[in-house]
Swiss-Prot record:
Enzyme class: translocase
Transmembrane portions of the chain: 27-51, 63-81
Organism listed in the record: Choristoneura occidentalis (Western spruce budworm)
Family: Belongs to the cytochrome c oxidase subunit 2 family.
Topology feature Mitochondrial intermembrane, residues: 1-26, 82-227
Protein name stated in the entry: Cytochrome c oxidase subunit 2
S-S bonds: none
Biological processes, Gene Ontology terms: ATP synthesis coupled electron transport
Protein's job: Component of the cytochrome c oxidase, the last enzyme in the mitochondrial electron transport chain which drives oxidative phosphorylation. The respiratory chain contains 3 multisubunit complexes succinate dehydrogenase (complex II, CII), ubiquinol-cytochrome c oxidoreductase (cytochrome b-c1 complex, complex III, CIII) and cytochrome c oxidase (complex IV, CIV), that cooperate to transfer electrons derived from NADH and succinate to molecular oxygen, creating an electrochemical gradient over the inner membrane that drives transmembrane transport and the ATP synthase.
Annotated keywords: Copper, Electron transport, Magnesium, Membrane, Metal-binding, Mitochondrion, Mitochondrion inner membrane, Respiratory chain, Translocase, Transmembrane, Transmembrane helix, Transport
GO CC terms: mitochondrial inner membrane
Ranges in the topological domain labelled Mitochondrial matrix: 52-62
Alphabetical list of SUPFAM superfamilies matching this protein: Cupredoxins, Cytochrome c oxidase subunit II-like, transmembrane region
Length: 227
């Protein structure tokens, strides 16, 4: 989850998020290099006294400043396209989770198991415990097994919502009458927080998402106890 004075992305909990962080750093390096180059040229032109009143065209310099930006864009576009296709790829998910957005809470259904569905509301401030996080904890967490491919189906019943877990690199719009899907792979145990990322009304800020990642053995025990 995000913490105070954290200017970076959240710590990765999935391979896709690691790739997103790598692409962010890769693009940022290119932007810094461009900024330094342009800044150096502007400062050098400002302080030198070279002029050429008879310069009407320069095919070579025009060729250079056309080819170099094109090459730079290719270095950004290729890893971006690779990552885009990785985010859309589904690889034999172990379980399917269905998430339904409401004003202003989430409900979940484990489609592979019978009678496992629940609503997830934010814990009000006056009911919080010492180990709860303000505006982030819920009464019913999503429990999922780590080190397994998971598919999530997302929809809504009223307005557009967005199901988002930053540390997993997942953000899916929940549209009424439409079923969107994506997949993720949690590679470590822990509790991961997210929030609705689409303005959906007065209490938009009060519909958090919490995933509890556990081992497959504990997940099976949870399924049996819930049933």
């Amino acid at each position: 989850m995000a913490t105070w004075s954290n200017f970076n992305l959240q710590n990765s909990a999935s391979p896709l998020m690691e790739q997103i962080i790598f692409f962010h750093d890769h693009t940022l390096v290119i932007l810094i290099m461009i900024t330094i180059l342009v800044g150096y040229l502007m400062i050098s032109l400002f302080f030198n006294s070279y002029i050429n009143r008879f310069l009407l065209e320069g095919q070579m310099i025009e060729l250079i400043w056309t080819i170099l930006p094109a090459i730079t864009l290719i270095f950004i576009a290729l890893p971006s396209l690779r990552l885009l296709y990785l985010l859309d790829e589904l690889n034999n998910p172990l379980i399917t989770l269905k998430s339904i957005g409401h004003q202003w809470y989430w409900s979940y259904e484990y489609s592979d198991f019978q009678n496992i569905q629940f609503d997830s509301y934010m814990i009000p401030i006056n009911e919080m415990k010492n180990n709860n996080f303000r505006l982030l904890d819920v009464d019913n967490r999503i429990v999922l097994p780590m080190n397994n491919q998971i598919r999530i189906l997302v929809t809504a019943t009223d307005v557009i919502h967005s199901w988002t877990i930053p540390s997993l690199g997942v953000k899916v719009d929940a549209n009424p009458g439409r079923l969107n899907q994506t997949n993720f792979f949690i590679n470590r145990p822990g509790i991961f927080y997210g929030q609705c990322s689409e303005i959906c009304g007065a209490n938009h800020s009060f519909m958090p998402i919490v995933i509890e990642s556990i081992s497959i053995k504990n997940f099976i025990n949870w399924i049996n106890n819930y049933s």
